[in-house]
Amino acid sequence: MMRFMTPFKHARNVLILFLSLLGLTLMMLFGSPWLALRSAFMPRSERQAYVRRAITTGYRRYFTTLHFFNVFHLDLTELDRLRGDDGLILTANHPSLFDALLIISRLPNVVCIMKAQVLRNVMFGHGAKMAGYIPNDSIRNIVNEAARELEEGSQLLLFPEGTRSRRGRINPFQGTVGLIARRTGCPVQTIFIESDSGFLGKGWPFWKAPDFPVRIRVRLGQRFSPGDDSKQFIAELQHYYEQELAPPACSTHRADDARTSASRP
């Protein structure tokens, strides 16, 4: 149902959007040099762990602030159950640009796969590079680096769709998670991100303010054991996500009834 927005509320939401994105940009812009200075003389493994913890702390404080000021209503507590589960592949649906940040804000030993051009960015990529995040430059490198990180006890975060989805849809899954799971034998923990808004999803302009607060819930799903057939594994995984994220039958019936009523003279 559409929520009516007065001009005053719209202006307020635009201001909230601007300040929220500005705060995130400044945190990422100045956080990397600060982390580089603090960890300059640490051994590689110690530096990586320190930077990951610092990134988790930074994002957690950021989202706590947004929650406090009624920008987001967040329910992320189920993610805390995964702390200490080493060598675990995490898969999640991808409804918005905030998805990876939300998960990282609760799990301090997560490694992500990022666009190579972002990792090469001097302003925004240095912190991610220090954290050991993996560039998506080639499948071979992704699989090899992911296997090494999982063997060392990291948790690997993947979005099987490969890109953000439009609200209410699931994009076709890519095969990377199946290749990594088969190569490493690590279990795959499914994660579901649910929101009442399409904010920063596929096709959502940066300048468009939603009706705040945006409500987001992250919940855990089934944990899968990898199979020998990667394609079959991916097909089963996608089918599971489609089932879990399908709208309730009653909602579908109401929408059908509304369309039928609207078509009557």
What is each model feature region?
Residues F72, Y133, C186:
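Short glycine/serine/threonine/alanine-rich loop segments
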Residues S32-T57, F69, G84-S138:
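Catalytic core of membrane glycerolipid acyltransferases/transacylases, capturing the structured
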Residues T77, M114-K115, D137, P160, ...:
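Thr-Gly-centered strand-to-loop micro-motif
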Residues R3-P7, I142-P265:
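Non-catalytic C-terminal accessory region of glycerolipid acyltransferases
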Residues M1-L88:
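Membrane-anchoring hydrophobic helices of lipid-metabolizing enzymes
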Residues F69-T77, N136-R140, L200-G203:
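Short gly/ser/thr-rich secondary-structure transition/capping motifs
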Residues L82, G127-A128, E149, I180:
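Structural alpha-helical scaffold elements that stabilize or flank donor/cofactor-binding regions
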